[in-house]
A protein has these predicted regions:
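Short, well-ordered beta-strand elements within core beta-sheets of diverse protein domains
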Residues: 16-21, 36-42, 127, 236-238, ...
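Conserved C-terminal structural/oligomerization subdomain of aldehyde/semialdehyde dehydrogenase
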Residues: 11-17, 334, 341-461
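ALDH superfamily catalytic-core signature
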Residues: 15, 210-351, 414, 460-461
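N-terminal Rossmann-like NAD(P)+-binding subdomain of aldehyde/semialdehyde dehydrogenases
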Residues: 1-113
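Residue-level signal for inorganic ion chemistry
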Residues: 12, 48, 70, 92, ...
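Structural signal for hydrophobic packing residues in well-ordered secondary-structure cores
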Residues: 34-37, 41, 56-63, 67, ...
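Rossmann-like NAD(P) dinucleotide-binding subdomain of oxidoreductase/dehydrogenase enzymes
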Residues: 105-246, 371
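Short loop/turn microsegments at loop-to-beta-strand junctions
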Residues: 1-4, 266, 388
Length: 461
């Protein structure tokens, strides 16, 4: 029988193995989720909120342990893992506190009688999530659906099975009934089979563009609502009036975040030609000299990538970029020894037509561009198939907002890399996917917005 392994990317050690579930086992899990849904949806908001509050409390109490699990299972810096767990607790609390208000009936104006929208749960949701934020991704999917009254069957990435198992245990301990949230151990090849199950009513995926296209096709074939959060190639535009030191520090720290394995990481830094030489020099010193090492060491700035394969994929992209004419300013090599470590890397002179110009590089690679003016910066920022996030960095905030309005993405941050907060929607445009998660937008994705009209027999049709 095939198994799913969890491997420490800093050492290469196999930590644990889980047998893959059979189709019949998964079918039984879906049956339980469907059965639980019929009762869970009847619970009051306060009863469902209690589970979310408890989950938040448990996560905060165990943040050191859970943060360490992020480190040993996918290589995240321990302090970043702890911050991720704190964020998850905040998301659970946000929906516990606001769910009933957000889902209250919405009156509609009508000339006769009255009408309103009633927001109702739809059933079992299949959620397929990636490894780069092993607790945040599952929380982002679980919290709004649980408060709505849906149930979740979650397939986590194959390299973070312990995190997937742990989230189910946390929610059960928090008081969720069996079947409200169930983690499954299956390969990606089983997903379309699950989407064929008529008991599954909705589908959410965060992952690569090819995975998203396949997932959406399988969901669409079954006429099921889906949301996708896919790749990104976020631009970080530096305005001419920017504080250079702060701009460099913000861009570099944003790219070091999670070893560059973040969909909204500032992958393309776009700098006015007047600031470019100084920016490049400062960025090379700060980024190129980042301390690489053990994710559990508080002094480490750059942890390993999630796997040796992930590192080799990134290095291959860097090598191809250089072969196609890009300039390698710093890094570009693997670090010898155990683990999936590589040097922080800076590329410049990237031109349209090169693979690096259009592809997402999911690792610690900073691409820096020089432009003549802000019009050119906006054109470059938009010249991508992706449309997830982005940054405009400058002193004149009013002008920065004007530039932000011209960027074709789902999110733009002023003077900060694209971030995450429970009350703010998260999602993109173009090939970065569709739909939104978090905030009021996220809670409406998997509900039946039912119109209820009260009128009389003689009213107009």
């Amino acid at each position: 029988m095939s198994s799913i392994k969890t491997i420490n990317p800093a050492t290469g050690e196999v930590l644990k193995e889980y047998p893959e579930m059979t189709s019949s086992e998964v079918s039984e899990i879906i049956a339980q989720a469907d059965k639980t849904f019929k009762e869970w949806r009847k619970k009051s908001f306060s009863e469902r909120a209690k589970v979310l509050y408890n989950a938040a409390r448990i996560m905060r109490e165990r943040k050191e342990e859970l943060g360490k699990l992020c480190s040993i299972e996918m290589g995240k810096l321990h302090r970043e893992g702890i911050a991720e767990v704190e964020l998850c607790a905040g998301i659970f609390e946000y929906y516990a506190e606001n769910g009933e208000k957000l889902l209250a009936d919405k009156p509609l104006e009508t000339p006769h009688g009255k009408a309103f929208l009633s927001y109702e749960p739809i059933g079992v949701i299949l959620s397929v999530q990636p490894w780069n934020f092993p607790f945040y991704q599952t929380t982002r999917s679980a919290a709004p659906n649980l408060i709505v009254g849906n149930t979740i069957v979650l397939k986590h990435a194959s390299n973070v099975p312990q995190a997937g198992e742990m989230m189910e245990k946390i929610l059960l301990e928090a008081g969720a009934p069996k079947g409200a949230y169930t983690n499954i151990f299956v390969p990606g090849s089983k997903v379309s089979e699950i989407l064929d199950d008529p008991r599954v009513k909705g589908a959410a995926l965060t992952g690569s563009e090819p995975a998203g296209a396949s997932f959406a096709s399988a969901a669409g074939k079954n006429v099921k609502k889906s949301i996708l959060e896919l790749g990104g190639s976020d631009a970080f535009i530096v305005m001419p009036d920017a504080d250079l030191d702060k701009a460099v520090e913000t861009a570099v720290n944003g790219r070091l975040w999670n070893a560059g394995q973040v969909c909204v990481s500032p992958k393309r830094v776009i700098v006015p030609e007047s600031l470019y030489p100084a920016f490049l020099e400062k960025a090379t010193q700060l980024f190129g000299n980042a301390k690489v090492g053990d994710p559990l060491d508080p002094e480490t700035q750059l942890a390993p990538l999630s796997s040796v394969k992930a590192r080799e994929d990134v290095l291959s992209q860097v090598e191809k970029a250089v072969a196609q004419g890009a300039r390698l300013v710093a890094g570009g090599k693997k670090i010898e020894g155990p683990g999936a470590f590589m040097q922080p890397t800076i590329l410049t002179d990237i031109k349209k037509g090169m693979d690096a110009y259009s592809d997402e590089i999911f690792g610690p690679v900073l691409m820096i561009y020089s432009v003549k003016n802000m019009d050119e910066a906006v054109d470059l920022a938009n010249d991508t198939k992706y449309g997830l996030g982005g940054t405009v960095f400058g002193t004149d905030v009013e002008e920065a907002v004007k530039i932000a309005r011209r960027i074709d993405t789902g999110m733009v941050y002023i003077n900060h890399v694209t971030g995450i907060s429970p009350e703010l929607p998260f999602g993109g445009t173009k090939n970065s996917g569709y739909g939104r998660e978090q905030s009021i937008e996220g809670i409406y994705e998997f509900v039946n917005s039912k119109l209820i009209r009260v009128t009389t027999p003689d009213a107009d049709y």
